[in-house]
Amino acid sequence: MAERVYPADSPPQSGQFSGNFSSGEFPKKPAPPPSTYVIQVPKDQIYRIPPPENAHRFEQLSRKKTNRSNCRCCFCSFLAAVFILIVLAGISFAVLYLIYRPEAPKYSIEGFSVSGINLNSTSPISPSFNVTVRSRNGNGKIGVYYEKESSVDVYYNDVDISNGVMPVFYQPAKNVTVVKLVLSGSKIQLTSGMRKEMRNEVSKKTVPFKLKIKAPVKIKFGSVKTWTMIVNVDCDVTVDKLTAPSRIVSRKCSHDVDLW
């Protein structure tokens, strides 16, 4: 019979252990190469973040960041609340406008007499005007409160020569109110050119003046009263003479409202 030939033992491959495990021997750790240093650090220093010398500083910075974050949150909440209030106010105003359809009162000049203007002297004048203003509130469900701190001025050639105020009163819906005003000026110095121009206008019986009214008002919608608004009335009035009684030759008024 032929003899069996067994393969020879192959040397151990790279990465395989060649130690005798049966005898309990394990391969030793390789020694570090020359010029290599191994530093061992205690575990309590490795996991300590931040290090002890910076711990207090770290706590201060963390506290500041928390405070800043809280301030930002409060400020953002405040802005959001203000924005919501503005939106709600705008919606309420729009609803009231659609329900009531408000219109500004109509104004006209019913009487306008002048006294105290002497064109034959160069001395300062102290003019006086008796003015009758008619206000018509045509709104069906809206009242108007005329507040304090109003102003009424009479101008000639852009020179303020007399002034006064509107009375404080309440004008209900669908109402016509006639207001009598007494306006006066003191020591108004007219130039020679203004006196000459006035004399020429008196001869033609067309002396022009401008009346300006600024009246703070509040509007009443049912039981709701609005904030203060400003009614501005501008009237061009022409009279025939500078003594009472004078006759109105022409008149024209316009108005607008400052909501804020």
Swiss-Prot record:
Q: Which UniProt keywords apply?
A: Cell membrane, Glycoprotein, Membrane, Plant defense, Transmembrane, Transmembrane helix
Q: Which InterPro entries has this protein been placed in?
A: LEA_2, NDR1-like
Give TM regions: 79-99
- Where is composition skewed (Low complexity) in this entry? 13-24
UniProt membrane topology term: Single-pass membrane protein
The highest taxon in the source lineage is Eukaryota
Induction (UniProt) = Induced by infection with avirulent Pseudomonas syringae pv. tomato DC3000 (Pst DC3000) carrying the avirulence gene avrRpt2. Down-regulated by Pst DC3000 virulence factors AvrE and HopM1.
Q: What happens when the gene is disrupted?
A: No visible phenotype under normal growth conditions, but mutant plant display enhanced susceptibility to the bacterial pathogen Pseudomonas syringae pv. tomato DC3000 (Pst DC3000).
Sites where a glycan is attached: 120, 130, 175
Q: Name one GO biological process term.
A: defense response to bacterium
Q: Which GO terms describe its cellular component?
A: plasma membrane; plasmodesma
**Region spans: Disordered:** 1-35
Which cell locations does it reside in? Cell membrane
General function of this protein:
Required for plant immunity against the bacterial pathogen Pseudomonas syringae pv. tomato DC3000 (Pst DC3000).
Quote the protein name from its UniProt record. Answer: NDR1/HIN1-like protein 13
Q: Tell me the organism.
A: Arabidopsis thaliana (Mouse-ear cress)
